């Protein structure tokens, strides 16, 4: 016979408030000043009289520091702050630009334009040069091309990984300054 599923008790997020604070004394701060160390029941009564909540600010201190404030406003402010932090967060991606050692000048300019756009967006760029057939005998052309890319982007980007040969391709990683 199957046992019924019993979910874990929900974990409460945020600071403890009012009756959840289970210590004999607290360091109390109200809107104006620090009221010092007082018994928890007196602190709860003062918060109730003010029509606000007793919120634990620093639970690890001895005695815990509590403040009389509106818990709803505190939670709202914390949510706003977290949303703002998420909005500002940018995940750095590595974009790849593929070239050949004998790339034409216009094609090179188009690739450089794309590379500059990636740097403006704050992304890293991995420049990959693919050698085919007998092109492997002329690796100096590939190195020369990667050095040209490095020189053309030195104002807006820095080299994160120097050009190196891996199998039939040469690669270099650039990061925005």
Swiss-Prot record:
Monomer. Belongs to the IF-3 family. Keywords: Cytoplasm, Initiation factor, Protein biosynthesis. This is Translation initiation factor IF-3. GO terms for molecular function: ribosome binding; translation initiation factor activity. Gene3D superfamilies: Translation initiation factor 3 (IF-3), C-terminal domain (3.30.110.10), Translation initiation factor 3 (IF-3), N-terminal domain (3.10.20.80). It comes from Rhizobium meliloti (strain 1021) (Ensifer meliloti). The keyword Kinase does not apply. It is found in: Cytoplasm.
């Amino acid at each position: 016979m199957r046992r019924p599923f019993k979910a874990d008790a929900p974990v409460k997020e945020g600071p403890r408030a009012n009756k959840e604070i289970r210590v004999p004394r607290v360091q109390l701060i109200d809107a104006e000043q620090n009221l010092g160390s007082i018994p928890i029941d007196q602190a709860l009564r003062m918060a109730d009289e003010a029509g606000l909540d007793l919120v634990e600010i620093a639970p690890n201190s001895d005695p815990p520091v509590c403040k009389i404030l509106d818990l709803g406003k505190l939670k709202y402010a914390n949510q706003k702050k977290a949303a703002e932090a998420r909005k500002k967060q940018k995940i750095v991606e590595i974009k790849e630009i593929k070239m050949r050692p004998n790339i034409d000048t216009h094609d090179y300019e188009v690739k450089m334009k794309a590379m500059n756009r990636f740097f403006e967006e704050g992304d890293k760029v991995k420049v990959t040069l693919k050698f085919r057939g007998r092109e492997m005998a002329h690796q100096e052309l590939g190195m020369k091309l990667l050095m040209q890319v490095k020189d053309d982007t030195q104002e807006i980007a820095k080299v994160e990984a120097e050009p190196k040969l891996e199998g039939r391709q040469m690669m270099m990683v650039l990061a925005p300054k």
